């Protein structure tokens, strides 16, 4: 077992691969580099276990970079009467805001009232929401009159379906950048003595006497294979958990009912105020969020069952039309396809429930399954509760005697970059990506290229690219433009235009040739085309 270490810079890839070759034995191996996997690895390493995380693509490549960017208790679950889930999520929201103030901040939401009893109905529910948050509440909810509602959300429609805007309710939840939180967790993992390797695919599970004893992995970028051992192997691969489970048991029944959620990015002019809008009930019974984020406006989401599991799901025309049409009903300015600067889709790992007709009604609570051979699988849940999910997973491993007992410390563990925030850190919600660097802001600004802006709409500079390459394990153009910076999700066309310069900088940092640059640009532009509406 290991003790907590001081903040550390991740080794370069060659050093990481050398570690796998030299040290094949681990206490814990976590498969999957999304919210759940990263959180689980941080929990394990911070308890002192020798921990390795492997990710087949890049950190947060899948669902974990495609959320609505909210750290929330779940107003919808309160309406369903799921008090325990809401209370847990609100508690975790408070912990995350405290432990990562450079990444999470309060955001006010306006709930418009167009019917006579909307305001008291939602107002009472939101007061319950406040009470459930207890001492970790971000700010109290309150009623708004007509004038206050429009002052908070100037682009709200004055009439919907012939009904006038009567007023509204204001409540607070948390906002964050999902991919940047994932990168912070990866850095935190190294800080507490763990190791993470992206582009490292699990190709098989090894067994001894019928018990899972390790994994075989292959370097996606270089081709080398490694046989690794562990007393505890954790499958945290989101909607893809069944593929790992079937490496142990080819007859294992699927446990995930994937649901696709689509979001659109619009210019900031569609939501010029500082508040978000929550539309409580759409035509399919879901809520619709209109949210300010990184100088733009996000609108979403949908809930469409899927049977296939693509790594890069694409938004269907029906989903796009549904969001635009619903937003048009509630906004004074009608958004069109021409206004959309990016569109993306993510797959939610909902746990199957027999007899449920719609994925919107399936549980977001996490599920932990231990196979006969000892493979621990965790799925379900959401970003807000990733820390509690991780605590439960490692607790399960301890209960099963896979690990010696050690206390969980993550409730009071500041994430990487949170300690000693500089006075000149950009304000929360100001749209500057520099805020996400926390106490490493001076390191970023010391790099060459701070004045070379590559994507004005996302604030990406050449210095950000160099920082990503040197300190954040970014290997490919996509890693930078999609997750170290959010250009692809904000302005896909501008991100595509910046790809050649990003490839050039990465080539300088990692020693690649012109052929590599050309291939990377082509690959990224193919990806980016799926984020644009033709």
Model-found features: residue ranges?
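Core beta-strand elements of the Rossmann-like FAD/NAD(P) dinucleotide-binding domain
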Residues: 24-26, 222-232
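N-terminal Rossmann-fold NAD(P) dinucleotide-binding loop
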Residues: 37
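Extreme N-terminal leader/targeting segments of oxidoreductases
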Residues: 1-28, 43-47
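C-terminal accessory subdomains/tails of enzymes that are appended
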Residues: 16-25, 29, 57, 103, ...
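Dinucleotide-binding Rossmann-like beta1-alpha1 core, especially the glycine-rich loop
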Residues: 69-152, 288
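Short hydrophobic core segments
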Residues: 31, 228-238
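A conserved short coil-to-beta-strand element within the FAD-binding core of flavoproteins
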Residues: 198-213
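Glycine-rich FAD pyrophosphate-binding loop
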Residues: 45-65
